[in-house]
């Protein structure tokens, strides 16, 4: 049984698991917790899933998990599909109001930068395994993960940001704000430079 099959089995049994691949690597890692316990991170070795605001961070402890790895199979079929989003006029109105409020707060110097988001609901079932295969194949330079806990939910993503890298006594992180499509020649505009500096200053403080 490969790691994707393992993940499918765990999801059906409602057991916690995480799959992840590091940037520019072709090894897929899997951590499969042996029971459905919601473990709060204290100092255990394991995979930590931390919310930005929550004081409770979840960990899959290595001492109570099966840890596996395998080469990523990139010879998979194209699983791309078009998502059909539910039309919600009220949600659009609320989001536009949120944007106006955000602009107003910036003008009032409440804060310098704000990132707004909204929830999008889709009308069809999504095969999360096929979607994750797409992430693995299409974003090889990103950290690609698929995380599930029955008491928290299922999360999937591909991020170019490096949270932390520690080598001997050197700590490295990435302040990623201004972004654009990668090309051999990149020209950063004033807007991106200012946004980048805001994040850099926040991390340093």
Labelled PLM ranges:
Residues 1-39, 122-125, 129:
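Short Lys/Arg-enriched alpha/beta "domain-start" segment
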Residues 14-17, 43-46, 141-144, 153-154:
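Short, surface-exposed beta-edge/turn micro-motifs
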Residues 19, 59-60, 156, 173:
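Generic recognition of long tandem-repeat/solenoid scaffolds
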Residues 22-122, 190-193:
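Non-catalytic accessory segments adjacent to catalytic cores
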Residues 24-26, 53-55, 152, 161-163, ...:
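Short, glycine-/Ser/Thr-/acidic-enriched flexible segments
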Residues 42-44, 163-205:
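Cytosolic ligand/metal-binding cores
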Residues 58-61, 126, 184-185:
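Short, conserved acidic/polar surface loops in the N-terminal third of protein domains
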Residues 73-161, 166, 170, 176-180:
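Intrinsically disordered, low-complexity linker/loop segments enriched in Gly/Pro
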């Amino acid at each position: 049984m490969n790691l994707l099959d393992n993940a499918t089995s765990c999801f059906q049994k409602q057991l916690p698991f995480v799959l992840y691949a590091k940037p520019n690597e072709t090894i897929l890692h899997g951590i499969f917790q042996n029971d459905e316990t919601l473990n709060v991170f204290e100092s255990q070795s394991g995979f930590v899933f931390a919310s930005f605001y929550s004081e409770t961070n979840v960990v899959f402890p290595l001492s109570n998990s099966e840890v596996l790895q395998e080469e990523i199979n990139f010879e998979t079929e194209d699983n791309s599909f078009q998502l059909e989003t539910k039309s919600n006029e009220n949600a659009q109105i609320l989001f536009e109001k949120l944007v106006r409020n955000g602009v107003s707060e910036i003008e009032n110097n409440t804060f310098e930068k704000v990132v707004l988001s909204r929830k999008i609901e889709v009308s069809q079932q999504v095969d999360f395994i096929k979607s994750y295969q797409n992430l693995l194949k299409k974003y090889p330079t990103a950290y690609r993960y698929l995380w599930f806990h029955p008491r928290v939910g299922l999360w999937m993503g591909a991020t170019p940001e490096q949270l932390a890298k520690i080598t001997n006594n050197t700590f490295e992180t990435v302040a990623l704000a201004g972004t654009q499509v990668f090309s051999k020649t990149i020209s950063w505009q004033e807007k991106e430079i200012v946004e980048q500096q805001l994040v850099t200053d926040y991390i340093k403080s």
